[in-house]
Structure formats: structure tokens, C-alpha cells
Amino acid sequence: MSNSMNGSNAKKRSSRPKEYDVFLKIVLVGRSYVGKSSLMIRFIDGTFNDFYVNTIGVDFRFKTIMVKDRKVKVQIWDTAGQEKFRTITSTYYKGADAILLVYDITNRESFDDINNYWIHEIEKNGSEVQNLILIGNKADYAAGIPEARL
């Protein structure tokens, strides 16, 4: 019997502090310019950037948060909204705990895309994903609502 199956190695591994209790993979999808990257950066860094930078392919970030005394490591995948990257985007649905469907409330077409394209893509390529969350973004642009009231 090798040492890896008993005693010494197992003890070394278990003595290391756990990095997290729960791991969540979240994927952001939606048309270009709806604010997916801004949502991710706001959650991860707590900052907002007025300048738009296209996501090329995908970007991902991690953040560890505490929820009810449990350390949760959140991995957020920010996918490109441009059509030329949509086939790449669908490969990231696998293993996702949630997919956030993001639209711009000032752009009706971005909302229509959710039902006309994104839902079908998720059903076709990510059928095991149970948690679909619809996010209407850019409320501050639509009504001039101060950030403090959001």
C-alpha cells in the first residue's frame, strides 16, 4: 500500500486550510454593449469604468465571499456578445451553476435577443444549467436614477 492512500500524505493535505467551502461558476451572456463586463468588474473590484472595451472571446475573474459563515469562491465568466464569438461562448456553459442573461433596458433588441437567441443556445448547449437569471442593466441610463437609490 502506498503512502498516498494512508497516513502521511493525507495528513499533509488535510492540514492545509481550506481555500473555500463552495465553488460557483457563473456565466454572463447577452448582446454586446449591455454591460456584462461592467457587472463583473463592479462585483469583483467594486469599481465602474465609463469606457467601453469589447470582450474578445471570454474573460474570467474570481472573488471569494462569505455567505452564512461559508467561504464561497465565485468564478465569473464574461463572454463576448458579438456574433462571431457566439460559438465559443456556448462552450463555457458546461459546468455552470448559473447563467446570467443580461440585457440593456434602454435597448429593446437586447431584450428580444434573450428569448430569440440566448435561451435557445443555452437549451442546446447547456441543458444541465438549472439557474437562469435575467438581469435588466443600465437602469441609471434609462431614468437618471442616482446610484445611491439603486
Placement of each model-derived feature along the sequence:
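Ras-like small GTPase catalytic G-domain
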Residues: 3, 8-29, 33, 38-46, ...
